[in-house]
């Protein structure tokens, strides 16, 4: 049973992620969604006593458990009202968010995708999940879909794939996910951002890349674009804003534009991105 995992908290950010996950499940034939809630220390009230010890207020625990159960019910209803054929399960963990996710992925081998809600510059809800996006995406053994709070789901037809010109012939991971890109009317846009203004790309290299992509993706329309921007993330988002883009796919490892960026710049890029979900392959 193909499964999507959605970490949740008490914010509109993860609620939107749940809505998108259900739509994604419908478009790509997933059958099961697991909602994961972890305990966050900031959610508890503490009774402080002498000698450095502290105890959690029992009333706070009961209140949190009740709130959590209501949250599960609310989010499950959001999914099932629109897609009653989907199976919805809940999971609760007392470990950190990243560890909880990795543990449940190991326990549930049917999980193929993690959907993460992300605060953005248009809407910020102080989501716990959003604060941990980078660590989750980097340590997750399965692909992750980052969903901006402001994003409203639309059918995926125009897919942008930023890539390194020197690693573009290593796109095997993308070819392993053809179920995403083989849909009817899908168009692929490969984008190389160079950060040096005087950098030129040899014509033979362009031809080689073109032939390689067409060899492996003969049935899928695709175009390769070359652009200059000192800031890679800015270059990608600028391109996406001026060219109809429904999804950005980040390639794994050193062939990904993420590989060259610090955590801060990735976080800033995700924060600036309010229009497109980002799928990070593994």
Predicted segments with their positions:
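A short acidic, glycine-rich active-site loop
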Residues: 55-70
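Residue-level recognition of beta-strand->loop/alpha-helix junctions
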Residues: 37, 92, 148, 192, ...
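Intrinsically disordered or low-complexity boundary/linker segments at protein termini
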Residues: 1-16, 107, 112-173, 272-282
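Structural beta-alpha unit
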Residues: 23, 40, 77-114, 217-248, ...
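Short secondary-structure boundary segments
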Residues: 118, 192, 251-253, 282
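Small/aliphatic-rich secondary-structure junction motif
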Residues: 1-56, 158-225, 245, 273
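Charged helix-capping and loop-helix junction motifs
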Residues: 128-132, 204-209, 262-267
